Amino acid sequence: MADEQLDEKNLNSEEAGAVNGDARVQELEEQLAAAKDQSLRAAADLQNIRRRAEQDVEKAHKFALEKFAGDLLPIIDSLERGLELSNADDDTIKPMREGIELTLKMFHDTLKRYNLEALEPHGEPFNAEHHQAMAMQESADVEPNSVLKVFQKGYLLNGRLLRPAMVVVSKSPAPAQPSIDEKA
């Protein structure tokens, strides 16, 4: 009888151990799943950080010239204004004009090489993202909200606005006011 009780106790303790063992295995599996999930999240975070860092470096390379290019734009404007104001038919300044034209061409070629492009919106519809309206002018010749005149060219650096074009924008002509004679 004592042997039966001992066998029964051993059996009960083995069953209890098996139940405890199953619970322990389940607990360890849950911990393993949590650790795997945490590892995957950490790997994804690391990948996102690398991607963001690469994008930041790419942007830094693309737009490193932004300030320098912006400082060159007034020089280009002055050269262009000098050509506009000089008389092309005057033989005394012809060599100077040719020198300015060559210098300006070199500037434009260099700017193009570094993805700096001029915005010359004359005749185009007004675009608030790329143009700065300096004045409105009535015009029956063109569509309303079209660029009539460009005071200063705008520029894009790698597709991003560096300087807006300063423009005069057209508006519809005002309806004619009836004269005093027509009112009577």
Swiss-Prot record:
Single GO cellular component term: cytosol
Highest taxon of the lineage: Bacteria
Locations listed in the record: Cytoplasm
Broad class of the protein's primary localization: cytoplasm
Disordered as annotated region, ranges: 1-24
Keywords tagged on the record: Chaperone, Cytoplasm, Stress response
Keyword Transcription regulation in record: no
GO BP, sorted A to Z: protein folding
Disulphide bridges, residue numbers: none
Cross-referenced PANTHER family: GRPE PROTEIN, GRPE PROTEIN HOMOLOG, MITOCHONDRIAL
Family the UniProt entry places it in: Belongs to the GrpE family.
Function summary: Participates actively in the response to hyperosmotic and heat shock by preventing the aggregation of stress-denatured proteins, in association with DnaK and GrpE. It is the nucleotide exchange factor for DnaK and may function as a thermosensor. Unfolded proteins bind initially to DnaJ; upon interaction with the DnaJ-bound protein, DnaK hydrolyzes its bound ATP, resulting in the formation of a stable complex. GrpE releases ADP from DnaK; ATP binding to DnaK triggers the release of the substrate protein, thus completing the reaction cycle.
Annotated HAMAP family: GrpE
Subunit structure: Homodimer.
Annotated protein name in UniProt: Protein GrpE
Native species: Pseudomonas entomophila (strain L48)
